[in-house]
Amino acid sequence: MTAQTLYDKLWNSHVVREEADGTALLYIDRHLVHEVTSPQAFEGLKLAGRRLWRVDSVVSTADHNTPTDHWDQGIQDPISRQQVETLDANIKAFGALAYFPFKDKGQGIVHVMGPEQGATLPGMTVVCGDSHTSTHGAFGALAHGIGTSEVEHVMATQCLVAKKSKNMLVRVDGRLGAGITAKDVALAIIGKIGTAGGTGYAIEFGGEAIRGLSMEGRMTLCNMAIEGGARSGMVAVDDKTIEYVKGRPFAPKGEQWNQAVAYWNTLHSDDGAHFDQVVALDAADIQPQVTWGTSPEMVAEVGGKVPNPANESDPVKKAGIERALAYMGLEADTPIEQIPVDVVFIGSCTNSRIEDLREAAAVAKGRSKAGNVKQVLVVPGSGLVKAQAEAEGLDKIFVAAGFEWREPGCSMCLAMNADRLLPGERCASTSNRNFEGRQGQGGRTHLVSPAMAAAAAVAGRFVDVRRLAAG
């Protein structure tokens, strides 16, 4: 039998039909739904007189538009309120069973609450009208974002028209140094391959450093796969995967659990499986990362400098650097550690899980927000994460440091709710995109890990968190 990659196995087990040109009909196991990309899809079903093909495949929540403070006042913005209320009405009308509405204890960012509910299982195909659906590949699943018209198609047919991607292996060899996180690994990979490096590929992350990551770290890594241009990212199933899933509400029980585990243990690339491209990094070389520009590939080590466009021979790249520096208000050759910050955001589907909050709290403990920092938002990824953090006393650490402890939601990851930057404000953010205007018109975003974000909050500028940890 021909050796298969993990992606090959996941793809082949879900193909319903394949045409000669490679176009395939792919069966979808899990459909995650939120309030932003679902209204048009539900409306299309209504107009056509269709129903949800598999009600039990849909898991939904409100996240993008929900406020993260003053929940007692409801949703103030009328457009945001309309989107959330429309989701409420559509879920009721179509009889979807698994819904975590605004203020529900299980509500949260769809890519956080889905896995913690066990709605994401190894071997599944998972889709959502959201580009960071690649997060769920951390479980040995085939997961990717889809457009609004595709959301309707999956709702109506439980299938998706797709073409198979090529296979890429990104291998991180060796062990990560102290203070180096999954976010640093993700940014280092994107810095190496670029934001188009994974275009046309499904990326499997492997190597000793990846196996050493927790499930939460793997979710962070796979979340960022799309920022490297890939359709999806994934990690092979191991004992950590199975232990994470065990006992969660949507996980199999009894004999079905035993059968599932037996299958899940096959979800890894076979020896000798062919990858169309292999990229290797040495874990020992990865340092804390900070983006300086307007794309995740514009990234440097914290001990480095902002690049000088005069040193770039490619005229297109040179122009890109010049434009990014102008937007970001930075001078060439500025040391990263001399860049001050105005706002810090710790949250998003990339870095709002309990492990992320613990890392940030470890830095904040016994310290205070720097005087030049206007605001530090700490936004848990779900109601369950919030409850766990409060049970551990993390909220008290943040508040004592002058940080704001908020309710769950997408928050300042994108300017779609009340949490946003003002023009010219510079933010150390644990989110996944630093595009122009992403966090608010004229806002300047630097992507970092939770620990690095907390370090910037107390130092007032970017600083190597490992120095703070050393005392």
From Swiss-Prot:
Catalysed reaction equations from the record: (2R,3S)-3-isopropylmalate = (2S)-2-isopropylmalate
Record-listed E.C. numbers: 4.2.1.33
Associated pathway: Amino-acid biosynthesis; L-leucine biosynthesis; L-leucine from 3-methyl-2-oxobutanoate: step 2/4
Protein origin, superkingdom: Bacteria
InterPro entries assigned to the protein according to its UniProt record, in alphabetical order: 3-IsopropMal_deHydase_lsu, Acnase/IPM_dHydase_lsu_aba_1/3, Acoase/IPM_deHydtase_lsu_aba, Aconitase_4Fe-4S_BS, Aconitase_4Fe-4S_dom, IPM_dehydratase_rel_enz, IPMI_cat
Coiled-coil residue windows: none
Keywords per UniProt: 4Fe-4S, Amino-acid biosynthesis, Branched-chain amino acid biosynthesis, Iron, Iron-sulfur, Leucine biosynthesis, Lyase, Metal-binding
Binding-site residues, [4Fe-4S] cluster: C349, C410, C413
Keyword Amino-acid biosynthesis: yes
Cofactor: [4Fe-4S] cluster
CDD domains membership: IPMI
Example of a GO biological process term: L-leucine biosynthetic process
Keyword 4Fe-4S set for record: yes
Cofactor note: Binds 1 [4Fe-4S] cluster per subunit.
Molecular functions (GO terms): 3-isopropylmalate dehydratase activity; 4 iron, 4 sulfur cluster binding; metal ion binding
Pfam families: Aconitase
Subunit structure: Heterodimer of LeuC and LeuD.
Family the UniProt entry places it in: Belongs to the aconitase/IPM isomerase family. LeuC type 1 subfamily.
Role according to the record: Catalyzes the isomerization between 2-isopropylmalate and 3-isopropylmalate, via the formation of 2-isopropylmaleate.
UniProt protein name: 3-isopropylmalate dehydratase large subunit
Source species of the chain: Chromobacterium violaceum (strain ATCC 12472 / DSM 30191 / JCM 1249 / CCUG 213 / NBRC 12614 / NCIMB 9131 / NCTC 9757 / MK)
Gene that this polypeptide is encoded by: leuC
